[in-house]
Amino acid sequence: MSRIGKKPVELPTGVTASVSGQTIEVKGPKATRSFTATDDVTLKVEDNVITIEPRGKSKRARQQWGMSRTMVGNLVTGVTNGFKKELEIQGVGYRAQMQGNTLKLNLGLSHEVNYEVPAGVTVTCPKVTEIVIEGTDEQLVGQVAANIRDWRKPEPYKGKGIRYKGEFIFRKEGKKK
């Protein structure tokens, strides 16, 4: 059984947290983010340390304890450092570029793919074959990266498509005569 909930979340300098009911609000140099925990846990802020305690001994309370601790830890990381996902594009003629708030992708389809970037996330293209997604919400950054990758997942024969930076694609051998 994981005991991640027992670990308190320490607040770095320049970050403040306040609890009102089941909602915790964390303010940092990059943003202000909040999280509402379930009634199975209690949240406390004392001496720049956030502690999460389960309200009972039930299985659900223990599950929410670990999950809430991880979510609060991600809030603190997001408002201090932020989160970043990098995508690589491989394939002849495959390219990406930002135009305003729209990511334009040429992926070998008969049309250009236009992806509207949601608020709270910044997308940049340092090269035409690289996409960098940054933001303070880990879930939103990962979801945007997954949505972009879904347009052309890497195929196993030539490796063409959009992949996460450093992702290993299992390559298959073609048909033999």
Curated annotation (Swiss-Prot):
PROSITE patterns: RIBOSOMAL_L6_1. The keyword Amino-acid biosynthesis does not apply. One of its GO terms (biological process) is cytoplasmic translation. Keywords: Ribonucleoprotein, Ribosomal protein, RNA-binding, rRNA-binding. It holds the Pfam family Ribosomal_L6. One of its GO terms (molecular function) is structural constituent of ribosome. GO terms for cellular component: cytosolic large ribosomal subunit. It comes from the Bacteria. The keyword rRNA-binding applies. Part of the 50S ribosomal subunit. This protein binds to the 23S rRNA, and is important in its secondary structure. It is located near the subunit interface in the base of the L7/L12 stalk, and near the tRNA binding site of the peptidyltransferase center. NCBIfam families: L6_bact (TIGR03654). HAMAP family: Ribosomal_uL6_B (MF_01365_B). Belongs to the universal ribosomal protein uL6 family. This is Large ribosomal subunit protein uL6. It comes from Dinoroseobacter shibae (strain DSM 16493 / NCIMB 14021 / DFL 12).
